[in-house]
Amino acid sequence: MIDLSPLVRRLAGTPLATWSQGLQAQLEAKLEKGHGDLDRWRGALESLPKLTPSQVDLVDGLRLDCDCDDATRAQMHQALMGLSPWRKGPFDLFGVHVDTEWRSDWKWSRVGPHLDLKGKRVLDVGCGNGYYQWRMLGAGADMVIGVDPNWLFFCQFQAVQQYLPELPAWHLPFALEELPANLEGFDTVFSMGVFYHRRSPIEHLLALKDCLVKGGELVLETLVIEGDENQVLVPEDRYAQMRNVWFLPSVPALERWLRRAGFSDVHCVDVSVTSVEEQRSTEWMRYQSLGDFLDPNDHGKTVEGLPAPRRATLLARK
């Protein structure tokens, strides 16, 4: 059982105290429903070697290390491979390099310098396997709660968390919609790689705003297109082979949407075209990746003939 009492204690005396009281029961109800592969993934977690890191780096990457032999490293490799595919990372765990599909460290190097997370209570919506949560702690966050309903990501987070049990990071297998309305308890809320999967983008912005304290900061990272404030791409069907992509606005359009949703001090801090070096198939993620989803003769287009992935990071205040 995952004991959330440290989280409840951490949130005592904060605007999130009332919410925290029901989290253990909510988590256990979700675990009761479970997932068909959950037992297999739990088996992988249980086979991880029992180690205590003597070196922890969450600032320049995500690296844990200690003195261990080749047999222990082989055990670590096999257990972590049992939690494949690994999407976000990379992770360096006791001499095992988990070369994930995404070079999420590249994204963090673009986003992180624009943020002040020192002492902040942070929510990461659609947190994946928690890679960014650890980097947020490395940047000085007081505590980080991630929410993502994907059970594999939940188990991948537990794989790292079992070696860092004292650190104030928690992964809850919940969707944003399962959080109460008007939570208003986080200093910083992240939504990275989620917005374009939402059928109702303004509703998503309002839900994110609901999670923030007054004056809190939103970090929004999403797919965009080039154009003016009236330009928005709605794919006819798939986008880069993804069925669940709905709205790709231009940066000026997205800035307008944020202002319309009641945010202020809206500004874009980064726009980057995603390269096949940043997102690709690896030993740890053997399925198709970005290179398979782009026009082989023109990487400026997807296989559907739409503009290739371009991602922007915007900051805004409640």
From Swiss-Prot:
Carboxy-S-adenosyl-L-methionine binds at residues 88, 102, 107, 126, 176-177, 192, 196, 311. Gene3D superfamilies: Vaccinia Virus protein VP39 (3.40.50.150). Pfam families: Methyltransf_9. CDD domains: AdoMet_MTases. Homotetramer. GO terms for biological process: tRNA wobble uridine modification. Its EC number is 2.5.1.-. Belongs to the class I-like SAM-binding methyltransferase superfamily. CmoB family. The gene is cmoB. PANTHER family: METHYLTRANSFERASE (PTHR43464), TRNA U34 CARBOXYMETHYLTRANSFERASE (PTHR43464:SF95). Keywords: Transferase, tRNA processing. It catalyses: carboxy-S-adenosyl-L-methionine + 5-hydroxyuridine(34) in tRNA = 5-carboxymethoxyuridine(34) in tRNA + S-adenosyl-L-homocysteine + H(+). This is tRNA U34 carboxymethyltransferase. Catalyzes carboxymethyl transfer from carboxy-S-adenosyl-L-methionine (Cx-SAM) to 5-hydroxyuridine (ho5U) to form 5-carboxymethoxyuridine (cmo5U) at position 34 in tRNAs. It comes from Pseudomonas entomophila (strain L48). One of its GO terms (molecular function) is transferase activity, transferring alkyl or aryl (other than methyl) groups.
